């Protein structure tokens, strides 16, 4: 099944995608990971993306669509994957429909107060990319990854000033996707304020219907 995860930054999309990709053998495609890989490799697109992200802005549709479509085309199994962070707006959603069919949308619903707490507490492993949270998913040892013992860091766009910009962009561009996908009965809502096990259980129940 082809899944798209929708929801504001910090709603747990990435964490749940990583968990289910292991349990259900789905490939997890994160636009954030794709962007960071290009930045790390200092590709021409990566240099452009780096400056855009550091300014707290969203990467242009033309770049995002190309990176995602190219990645999907490299997959051996194009029927079982999770898209995390794409599409972000109607233009991207329409572009996605031109090269993918039979997509189910998972919409993560979360109270904004909980959202801010999650975002400010998020920590990421510098070595393996593992995602933790000092409030909701703390590591056994402070600042150290449970998976590989790498050091944890806080992303620049998880600090308050960048958070405000990201949430504004979400409300302006991403939320209309809910209406877009509701019209053709592809939208499945999940209460993302539950703990990780609860969200995972809800998602598996949805997947089992299709």
Curated annotation (Swiss-Prot):
Pathway: Purine metabolism; AMP biosynthesis via salvage pathway; AMP from ADP: step 1/1. GO terms for cellular component: cytoplasm. Residues 121-158 are annotated as: LID. Residues 30-59 are annotated as: NMP. GO terms for molecular function: adenylate kinase activity; ATP binding; zinc ion binding. Zn(2+) binds at residues 125, 128, 145, 148. Its main location: cytoplasm. InterPro entries: Adenyl_kin_sub, Adenylat/UMP-CMP_kin, Adenylat_kinase_CS, Adenylate_kinase_lid-dom, P-loop_NTPase. Disulfide bonds: none annotated. Its EC number is 2.7.4.3. Pfam families: ADK, ADK_lid. Gene3D superfamilies: P-loop containing nucleotide triphosphate hydrolases (3.40.50.300). It catalyses: AMP + ATP = 2 ADP. AMP binds at residues 31, 36, 57-59, 85-88, 92, 155, 166. GO terms for biological process: AMP salvage. ATP binds at residues 10-15, 122, 131-132, 194. It comes from the Bacteria. Keywords: ATP-binding, Cytoplasm, Kinase, Metal-binding, Nucleotide biosynthesis, Nucleotide-binding, Transferase, Zinc. It is found in: Cytoplasm. Monomer. Consists of three domains, a large central CORE domain and two small peripheral domains, NMPbind and LID, which undergo movements during catalysis. The LID domain closes over the site of phosphoryl transfer upon ATP binding. Assembling and dissambling the active center during each catalytic cycle provides an effective means to prevent ATP hydrolysis. Some bacteria have evolved a zinc-coordinating structure that stabilizes the LID domain. Belongs to the adenylate kinase family. Catalyzes the reversible transfer of the terminal phosphate group between ATP and AMP. Plays an important role in cellular energy homeostasis and in adenine nucleotide metabolism. This is Adenylate kinase. It comes from Borrelia turicatae (strain 91E135). The gene is adk.
